[in-house]
């Protein structure tokens, strides 16, 4: 691990199984946590579906499982409330540990971060 613990804010904007970017970002997040860095994740646009409960893909690695593991390891995960409303996704459809937020919440995540990564 590096000498200074870093804070990463990761923005996921792609849907769960529309590209590999969400999966790659979740793998990065998990690795960063294992190396004792702090991780914030902001789900925006179609990326909100990465945090949806009851995912059951047959031919892809389950990003929902990755998200659960990352949350259990201490990641701070928030989803854009406006994006959720536009797509008809309610808070009770999100995995436990994911909080609905606004752009103000996203700005706070970015302000505390050493690095912000967009996918």
Model-identified regions with their sequence ranges:
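Short, conserved active-site loops that position catalytic residues or coordinate cofactors/metal ions
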Residues: 41-52, 82-83
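Short amphipathic alpha-helical segments and helix-helix/interface helices
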Residues: 29, 64-68, 106-107
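A glycine-rich helix N-cap at a beta->alpha junction
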Residues: 57-85
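Anion (oxyanion) recognition and catalysis
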Residues: 33-34, 71, 110-111
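Short, glycine-rich nucleotide/cofactor-binding loops
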Residues: 4, 8-23, 50-57
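Histidine-anchored nucleotide/phosphate-binding helix
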Residues: 22-37, 41
């Amino acid at each position: 691990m590096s000498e200074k613990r870093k804070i990463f804010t990761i923005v996921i904007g792609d849907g769960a199984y529309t590209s590999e970017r969400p999966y790659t970002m979740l793998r990065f997040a998990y690795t960063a946590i294992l190396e004792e860095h702090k991780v914030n994740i902001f789900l925006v646009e179609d990326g909100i579906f990465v945090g949806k409960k009851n995912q059951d893909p047959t031919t892809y690695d389950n990003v929902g499982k990755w998200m659960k593991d990352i949350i259990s390891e201490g990641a701070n995960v928030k989803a854009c409330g406006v994006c959720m409303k536009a797509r008809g996704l309610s808070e009770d459809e999100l995995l436990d540990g994911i909080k609905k937020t606004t752009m103000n919440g996203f700005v706070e995540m970015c302000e505390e971060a050493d690095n912000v990564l967009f996918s």
